[in-house]
Amino acid sequence: MSADLRKRKKDTTADNDAPQEAQAEEENKKEKPSSCRYRFLWKLLLGLLLIALLFGIKIHRDNELVRQQEAALRTLGAEGLFLFSSLDTDNDMHISPEEFKPISEKLTGISTTSDYEEEELLDPNGETLSVASRFQPLLMETMTKSKDGFLGITHSALSGLRNWTTPVVPNNVFYAGQFKAFLPPKNKLEVGNPWWIIPSELSIFTGYLPNNRIYPPPPKGKEVIIHKLLSMFHPRPFIKTRFAPQGSVACIRAISDFYYDIVFRIHAEFQLNEPPNFPFWFSPGQFTGNIVISKDAAHVRHFKLFVPNNRTLNVDMEWLYGASESSNMEVDIGYLPQMEIESLGPSIPSTIYDENGNIMESRNAEGEAIEFVFEDINWQSEMTFEEAARKLEVTMYPFKRVSYYPFPEAFDRALAEKKLVHSVLLWGALDDQSCUGSGRTLRETVLESLPVLALLNESFISTWSLVKELEELQSNKDSYATFASLHLEKYNFPVEMMICLPNGTVVHHINANYFLDITSLKPDEVETNLFSFSDGVEDLSTVTYIKFLKEGLEKAKPFLHS
């Protein structure tokens, strides 16, 4: 009985509590949105305050930096500030010991050990490779400015160029393991499959690196061996060029059981002047070459690196006349007869053992060096050096997916295939780093556009030529001299694009500067009747170049059918 009574009381209490809990829960639900809203507003307010604080700190730091730069300008002058800025690589307006090191080495004549090294430690007992550098200075008379005796050019501007007559390190010794950077990645082990040793970080969209620099940044990783090699020529090599395409690319030319023959192409440049003179940039068209190396990088059979000298001009030069990036700049091009590094023989063990495991002297009783006999390499799969170099060229320059033939051959092919000639005439090579500014823009934009490539491949034979080469060809007495004269009559600095008949007649042409001007218009400035955005092509430069090519085809019809 008493138990039933307790149960009824408990049930009554539970029934009374249920409405109260429901009521409390309902009130909490009403309060919860309001509470969440307040918490959200507080978080938003705190976030905005934090952003404002960070923005204020940035403004303060920027103002402080401007104040320091203005004070430095008053103290040092423009040229002094330029020298200071060239050393201040992190732009904090303070020179650290590491940043001061180039000046210290210059004043004391003592080069300290570099902090940077390969990512992997080298085997001190590994094989060593002896190499020699060969260098013949640029022929000053090949520069355009030489025609008027370098009128208006200060002696100090060219001092670094004039004084560079020999390599700074004629001979050097490397560990074979240092050349491991040239080995292919695991997914590029086939003949003719290119890979990037040092990737390019620039494009037409990212712009270019500053001109007003004196000293190169410390190399990292795979850049180290290339930096050390090029430092044999000059103490200030820049492994990352100012203009695209940067970097180094390679592919396997041949494979055997134990060796690769690897062809490579390197884009690098040098800054020749020393403070207080302003920078002078020396940009060879390219470094190319090959290395025969064991698959484990323990042995190097052969190594050669060189600047091709088969063209009449192969080096671009640019120098500043002021301390800022906007200062006046002179540009010229010239011919470099020789710039190469070659191994003096295969790599050899640093320690020599006899058949009993005893260490031997490196020279015999007569004092002559012990000669090593190396087995012949039987290549199982291979291509020619030229074929491999072509693969690398297309990797660096996608516009070369269309073949560009030598000037005479282009007209012979056009006659045989009944096509027109698409010709680009300029004063720096279109397919290397000696190219001029507007030529660079063309090859990195419109000439590599897929619609343009398709039309060129279908209806034209393409060629590009140096002005200097056609001037020399013009002086000959063969039929191509007339073709050269017809080209030069239409040429305007710096680049002229032409459409020609197989007999050399120029039926249509456009200057690169004019082309770039009209294709840089804003969309609302473009006359709709001037351009037709058909076939799904919306890029103005591509549309304009296709229009130029089609106009050439149209203008050639009366001549082709006559």
Swiss-Prot record:
Residues the record marks as carrying a glycan: 163, 310, 457, 503
Region (Disordered): 1-30
One MF annotation (Gene Ontology) recorded for this entry: oxidoreductase activity
One GO cellular component term noted in the UniProt record for this chain: endoplasmic reticulum membrane
Primary location: endoplasmic reticulum
Residues passing through the membrane, by range: 40-60
Subcellular locations according to the entry: Endoplasmic reticulum membrane
UniProt biased composition (Basic residues): 1-10
Key words of the record: Endoplasmic reticulum, Glycoprotein, Membrane, Oxidoreductase, Selenocysteine, Transmembrane, Transmembrane helix
Annotated function: Plays an important role in cell protection against oxidative stress and in the regulation of redox-related calcium homeostasis. Regulates the calcium level of the ER by protecting the calcium pump ATP2A2 against the oxidoreductase ERO1A-mediated oxidative damage. Acts as a modulator of ryanodine receptor (RyR) activity. Plays an important role in muscle development and differentiation during early development.
Name of this protein: Selenoprotein N
Organism: Xenopus tropicalis
